Amino acid sequence: MEEKGSKMVEQGNQDAPAPPETMAQPFPSAQFAPPQNGIPAEYTPSHPHPTPDYSGQTPVAEHTLNLYTPAQTHSEPSGPDNSIQAVSGTATQTDDSAQTDSQQQTQSSEITEIKTQPKRLHVSNIPFRFRDPDLRQMFGQFGKILDVEIIFNERGSKGFGFVTFESSADADRAREKLHGTVVEGRKIEVNNATARVMTNKKTVNPYANGWKLNPVVGAVYSPEFYAVPGFPYPAATAAAAAYRGAHLRGRGRTVYNTFRAAAPPPHIPAYGGVVYQDGFYGADIYGGYTAYRYTQPATATAAAYSDSYGRVYAADPYNHALAPAATYSVGAMNAFAPLTDAKTRSHADDVGLVLSSLQASIYRGGYSRFAPY
């Protein structure tokens, strides 16, 4: 029995293994062309497709390559991108840190320079008996002092001064400690000294003719330089030029001789009377130019006078008229006012008023108490 059993085992082992079940092979579908012109064509059966072999491992390997090949292709460029991004991020962080360090160094250097620069303090309300050593002793405890200055005038100390420290930090510390302290009953004030801005302000002249005084007052006090456009006495211009060009001692008498030698202006009929206020003689009324010391030519014309303005004659026909008047004093010419209203007064009245004041100033100039001779 044992032999039979062994034989059976051997026979069982000798049997060929059963072939694996094969998959159903697909049958190729016959492809028929459409009939042309109703004539049936002979069709040969097409060759069947080769049966694919599914038993081997080659298809699995092929599928493996097909599955992982695109993954490897996509994974290859990702490495350099990540490395580039990492490097660029590191470089950006490095640049930012370098800029921050440079800014901090610059700021620290600027702060150091500011602290080491000299600084000037303005000290006000200090005692009047204080002198430079006293102020230096007061501020010297806070640092090295370069300069101390107390402002004086002809009567003594003005109560304020300046202290210059070598270091700005010492100056700030002294200002914080000493500002508001009481010294000898006076509360001193310590502030940073600032430079005074000097601006050249041009004064606006209210008069178009260049005079700061009004024309009437200017004609009374300085007739030799009273020359404005339209003024009907051009001799003043020539006289002013002669006065500026001549080297004279004391009062320029030649100026007044030029005025006396020049022919007087014509009479203006529209000019009314003038009231001169005199404290000694009361109110004296003088009409026009007739009561003046100059005689008025009756037949002269304006053209003739325009040709003779500024002409110096050999004789001085009006020299005898410079004696003091018998009816009024020199002080009577100081204050005067026209009788006519300012609204109804014409331009001729104003011109006559200026001319009268001009002649009055010439009269007074001959007896000026400021003349040295």
UniProtKB/Swiss-Prot annotation:
Q: Which SUPFAM superfamilies match?
A: RNA-binding domain, RBD
A Pfam short name: Fox-1_C
Q: Which residues form the signal peptide?
A: none
Q: Which UniProt keywords apply?
A: Cytoplasm, mRNA processing, mRNA splicing, Nucleus, RNA-binding
Low complexity bias spans: 24-36, 90-109
Q: Where in the cell is it found?
A: Nucleus; Cytoplasm
- Primary localization class, coarse: nucleus
Biased region (Polar residues) positions are 66-89
- For the RRM domain, which residue ranges apply? 119-195
Q: Can you name this protein?
A: RNA binding protein fox-1 homolog 1
What is the organism field in this record?
Danio rerio
